[in-house]
Amino acid sequence: MSAPNLIECNPDHGRDDPVFGGHHPMRVVVGGAGIDLLDGTTIGVLLALQKNHGALAMGVLSGIRVVEFEAIGPAPFGTMLLADMGADVVRIDRPQKASDLGPKLEGKRADITGRNRRSVTLDLKRPDSVAVALELIERADVVIEGFRPGTMERLGLGPEVALQRNPRLVYGRMTGWGQTGPMADRAGHDLNYIALSGVLSSIGPAGGRPVPPLNLVGDYGGGGMLLAMGVLAALVNVQRGGAGQVVDAAMTEGAAQLGSVIWGLLAGGHWKEQRGSNLLDGGAPWYDTYETGDGQYMAIGPIESRFYGQMLDILGLSNADLPSQHDRTGWPRLREAFTAAFLGRTRKQWEEAFEGSDACVAPVLGLAEAARHPHGVARGSFIEVDGVVQPVPAPRFLGTPSAQPQPAPERGEHGGAALRDWGFDTAAIERLRELGLGFGA
């Protein structure tokens, strides 16, 4: 896709990257021609104009080394968060074709959660490959793996072996059910984990079935994000003089933790275990989405009375003619009034009507639209790298900004460089090549 207000960097401003190799000119979504490129507030612009920024020399986690074992879903997302913050991530990939690893775009990897890595290809069924993996682990601060419990132990790479060789190591383990328990060895996916957590039962319309919330709650929010948080906390402990340890991140527990506020509301008698009957699940007519006259949608959430009043004014409705906002018996009438009002104009017209207000109303944007929205454009919230529009690293650090994201590597693409940077000498790397292990330049 194309995005508006793009600045095409001069090729001299691209990256001749000594770490990743190759030249990477790029474009970034910015706020327009009149923006002050030196004001330091638009992080997307800073990313675009950095000239001397080796990918692993920037970011708040610069200097932290991570060994990631190839996986799908939450573990790569958690590792992406660390890599976006500047960690030096070496991913150990299986010896398969790059096309087997993820989506492609014009010959380049379009797997955004795989960005900012370097790849070493190892066949972990071979003792020589396991030996290389252990050498990397000895040099690492963090290991991330997302296999079923017991897999790493069977490979000879489990935490007991790893921590014996590197006592300061943080060993992150990402699973659905956790490392222990009667279901630990069972297969599953995001939807299964959030079903068992209790969260899925609360998502969906009144009288309808539970609805999958994409794979955001289990895989990413309750999985990879909490894995990264746990790893960072364990790193702080090590830097304070503590020992390395295992971080057991289970999506069932992570998803349940994301629902902590709901558990509190339930305990306080303010939540019904009936979908679509509560304030935050679409039960309240003033916390829901409404169709507009052109078949698009607006999202409304004016919980506070002062915001609610502004919304009514802009909708052309009078509070005096409607049931009280918090009178549940009147919610059906409120929903009818809001439905009729929003159908009276297009989404664009409603956007213009609510512009600048505190009514807590926003358009429901598609992904491509989100990258073009003026607010995101002004902040540089999206960036285009090798033809792939994607979110910039978040959160943003104003004192130690993240480097320009690099696309996910092909298998073994930068293995030789990664091994050299991690202390393997040229002779050792050449011996590994002779053994048939797949390293790139």
What role is predicted for each listed range?
Residues 37, 49-240, 410, 416-441:
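N-terminal helix-loop segment corresponding to the beta1-alpha1 unit
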Residues 179, 208-218, 239-255, 275-282, ...:
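Conserved Rossmann-fold dehydrogenase catalytic segment
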Residues 197, 223-244, 257, 261-269, ...:
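Oxidoreductase and adenylate-handling cofactor-binding alpha/beta cores
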Residues 281, 285-357, 361:
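Aromatic-enriched alpha-helical interface/lid elements that frame and gate functional surfaces
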Residues 292-296, 337, 347-348, 393-441:
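An anion-binding loop in the catalytic cleft
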Residues 355-405:
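A glycine-rich dinucleotide-binding beta-alpha-beta segment and adjacent secondary-structure elements
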